[in-house]
Amino acid sequence: MPSEKDGAKKSLMQRLALKSRIAKETLSEFLGTFIMIVLGCSSIAQAVLSRERFGGIITINIGFASAVVMALYVTFGISGGHINPAVSFAMCAFGRMEWFKFPFYVGAQFLGAFVGAATVFGIYYDGLMAFAGGKLLVVGENATAFIFATYPAPFISTPGAFVDQVVSTMFLLLIVFAMFDSRNLGVPRGLEPVVIGLLIIVLSCSLGLNSGCAMNPARDLSPRLFTALAGWGFEVFTVGNNFWWIPVVGPMIGAFLGGLIYILFIQMHHSKLDPDMKAEPSENNLEKHELSVIM
């Protein structure tokens, strides 16, 4: 029989358990974004601070994509695993999530990314201090700011960088919309995070040169703000011809375009009753409209 101690623990857990659905989803988005930033940015830190003895561009791309996968497995069933304001915006814009949830999701994502960046800084503090003789640099061969946020390649123009962010995020959302379209091929239940991780790898390997393939305003702006406060200074906002706003605005536009393109080219043309498509059980479609992500 359960002891009084077990009963007391259960009672405490019940009292602490959140009853509000939006509160649960907000915590989920915070934790998921935190996980993504800690594991993803740490994969960059390990490569940079070891001067590529413990990694390089391949391990960074795989590491960050895998961080997204892990974050999704933690959050998918609770909040849909957006972990990206651009994804949440697209979900709301196309009626797949209620607008009142948007500020809760986005606030949690930005806060989770900021705390995640602070955690990476703490983990690799000694390495950061040793890397450039105690200096925290934004540019140059000993720069470390790009461990936390993306920066443009020297050759890219401001319009080029903006288009780069729009296009990369457009592909992200276009394919995510396809994955969760029950009238299309779809993905086996439970494997969605893995396929999204593969998508992140493809995008990073093909569209990462120009400006780092952020595709996520929270992933970029919150860590950038942290670095400004932690010792790199506000040069993180002025470098690259004031590049900072591009990974914030570009993904929002790209996410909307990606969803719109999929709907216009594919989804709106589904027959109401397609004999070649078998309807999925309602259990498998539960809240499928909210499921999606990004880096």
UniProtKB/Swiss-Prot annotation:
It is found in: Cell membrane; Basolateral cell membrane. CDD domains: MIP (cd00333). It is a multi-pass membrane protein. Detected in testis and liver. Detected in immature spermatocytes and in interstitial Leydig cells. A motif (NPA 1) lies at residues 84-86. Keywords: Cell membrane, Membrane, Repeat, Transmembrane, Transmembrane helix, Transport. InterPro entries: Aquaporin-like (IPR023271), Aquaporin_9 (IPR015685), MIP (IPR000425), MIP/Aquaporin (IPR050363), MIP_CS (IPR022357). GO terms for molecular function: channel activity; glycerol channel activity; hydrogen peroxide channel activity; polyol transmembrane transporter activity; purine nucleobase transmembrane transporter activity; pyrimidine nucleobase transmembrane transporter activity; urea channel activity; urea transmembrane transporter activity. GO terms for biological process: amine transport; canalicular bile acid transport; cellular response to cAMP; detoxification of arsenic-containing substance; glycerol transmembrane transport; polyol transmembrane transport; purine nucleobase transport; pyrimidine nucleobase transport. The keyword Disulfide bond does not apply. It comes from the Eukaryota. It holds the Pfam family MIP. Residues 44-57, 124-160, 208-210, 226-243 are extracellular. It catalyses: H2O(in) = H2O(out); glycerol(in) = glycerol(out); urea(in) = urea(out); (S)-lactate(in) = (S)-lactate(out). One of its GO terms (cellular component) is plasma membrane. Gene3D superfamilies: Glycerol uptake facilitator protein. Homotetramer; each monomer provides an independent glycerol/water pore. Belongs to the MIP/aquaporin (TC 1.A.8) family. Aquaporins contain two tandem repeats each containing three membrane-spanning domains and a pore-forming loop with the signature motif Asn-Pro-Ala (NPA). Aquaglyceroporins form homotetrameric transmembrane channels, with each monomer independently mediating glycerol and water transport across the plasma membrane along their osmotic gradient. AQP9 is the primary route for glycerol uptake in hepatocytes, supporting hepatic gluconeogenesis. It exhibits broad specificity and may transport various small, non-charged solutes, including carbamides, polyols, purines, and pyrimidines. AQP9 may also facilitate hepatic urea extrusion. This is Aquaporin-9.
